[in-house]
């Protein structure tokens, strides 16, 4: 395998074990990064498990089917016997039945032989946080491997276990068993992309990584799609967050909404779908918020952008974020943002208060005060929105993300070529 020159277009295999198109960072990352890479003149083929991404027409998609055991409206379904094709399908089903999450491991088992058989067609493989052991066989076969760690899922694990009743904690530990696998594999990948310094520090701490493995490459936002638009709806607050995931802090936001004075006329739209009968639905009922909270699921990117631009305030109440696409989307929309001062959010928003208001995580009183203050002060909302848009335009473009990613690709390719050449040198 010859190494491409320093300016030659690269042939990139971008892998993602699931790529939900319009929500969740993985699908957005795959779509936007692949689009920008081809815009820079590179050739990209995405290999994805379901749900499959929606990609630029210039990007080739190779579907890597699975049993898709978590698909709505029937998650944790029982497959028909005719659906089982091989041992990997059996492993996927058995892992689900024993309370584990199989997809990162089983996706890599499926995609690795495909990549190995087509190794001559690519210059580099870029894994989007599957980090299954089978991917290492691709690297050993001579294909340079780069991986993205949005943040170590160990953070999600600890927060979910802490929030769960005692009788669910053992099951959650089993569910998050794949995290140990990801840490083991990540330690063997020489080039890892992380979106923030915060994620870098957390990956070093939780995954035992070396600082020299990590490259901080912030994500971007589509500033043509997410932009200031027409008039805003009085009192509208928008949050893009998984409704029943403790990490996202929606319960804190709901309690803050309940505490807001009536004169603000505050109404919350959450871009998510709560679990029927789950903790979020119960809390909405308990707080008497059914008339003030609307859940909007299944929106397109354009629909999300229009909604975000119509709000007076956006909120990211997370207990942790490795980057936060919803935060930069709100900022690009010129919408005044209130966010938790955790993880990478201070890196994204800035600490000077010009582009957004940071509050302590899980502090209902502070969140109530911050949101209420913005709803009562149109001039301050406008000033924050203007500064936020300028910050995004300066720091967070997908083109810059793609350019920085290509620099890491070329470094990984050059190092792999040097290692091959060293192996081929005759022993003196």
Q: What function would you assign to each model-found segment?
A:
Residues 280-302:
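Nucleotide-activated donor-binding/catalytic signature segment of Leloir-type glycosyltransferases, i.e.
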Residues 2, 6-9, 47-112:
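A conserved catalytic-core segment of Leloir-type glycosyltransferases
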Residues 198, 220:
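Carbohydrate-associated surface elements
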Residues 351-352, 356-364, 373-378:
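Conserved acidic donor-binding segment of nucleotide-sugar-dependent glycosyltransferases
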